[in-house]
Regions:
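Short acidic/histidine-rich motifs immediately flanking catalytic phosphotransfer sites
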Residues: 39-48
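Amide-donor transfer/coupling interface in amidating biosynthetic enzymes
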Residues: 73-74, 107-204
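Cysteine-nucleophile active-site neighborhood
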Residues: 50-122
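Extreme N-terminal starter segment of soluble prokaryotic enzymes
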Residues: 2-6
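Short acidic low-complexity segments
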Residues: 28-40
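Short hydrophobic segments within beta-strands
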Residues: 8-10
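Structural signature of beta-strand start/N-cap positions in the alpha/beta core
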Residues: 28, 43, 78-80, 144
Length: 204
């Protein structure tokens, strides 16, 4: 069965660019927060830009969280969180106050210790593979992705970190726990490497 992707719509500004990428790759994608679209999808993508607390407020208001937890945590539907969509997987975020996250991957989101580097972290950076990751299959040495953020995921366990990046200090670029994947960078802005990463996600 060909993958059918639901890009979860909670008012994030980059849902259309992610949807355009899915279409460009030749797959069926729908931007939606409707239960039928979520249950009928084979894969779920949660894009995200902006602050942790604001994202969580919109997610709680606009997405059926009980259904999502059933689909993702119980039924193990493949899930990809992008940028803020990765960060909200944490237990708590500390951006403009302390805010509860989804708590799907234990950890916290804290401000980058940039050690003199300019914030926000904007631009291309090479990521460093730490553990085998199906998202990076076939990418070889081309591990250059586009980042835009000032906060980073600090997981409770380092076992979920599949790749990291250095910008002042080292922090996770890709995390994974079972069917849950998160990327701090924007694959939809990362040209061929980003396209290949999403292509690798869709057969999972």
């Amino acid at each position: 069965m060909k993958p059918k992707v639901c890009i979860l719509d909670y008012g994030s500004g980059n849902v259309r660019s992610v949807s355009n990428l899915i279409t460009h790759l030749g797959y069926e994608g729908v931007v939606s927060n409707q239960p039928d679209d979520i249950t009928q999808a084979t894969h779920l993508i949660l894009p995200g830009v902006g602050a942790f607390g604001a994202a969580m407020k919109k997610i709680r208001e606009k997405l059926p969280l009980e259904l999502l937890e059933q689909e993702v945590l119980t039924d193990s539907k493949p899930f990809l969180g992008i940028c803020a969509g990765m960060q909200v997987l944490a237990d708590v975020g500390h951006e403009f106050g302390k805010h509860a996250g989804l708590g799907w991957i234990p950890g916290e989101v804290r401000g980058l210790d940039s050690r003199g580097e300019v914030l926000p972290h904007i631009g291309w950076n090479d990521i460093i593979l730490q553990n085998p990751c199906p998202l990076l299959e076939g990418l070889g040495e081309v591990l250059d992705f586009y980042f835009v953020h000032s906060y980073a995921f600090a997981p409770q366990s380092g076992d979920c970190v599949k790749a990291s990046v250095e910008y002042g200090t080292k922090f996770p670029a890709i995390i994974q726990r079972d069917n849950l994947y998160g990327v701090q960078f924007h694959p939809e802005k990362s040209q061929k490497a980003g396209q290949r990463l999403v292509m690798n996600f869709l057969p999972l």
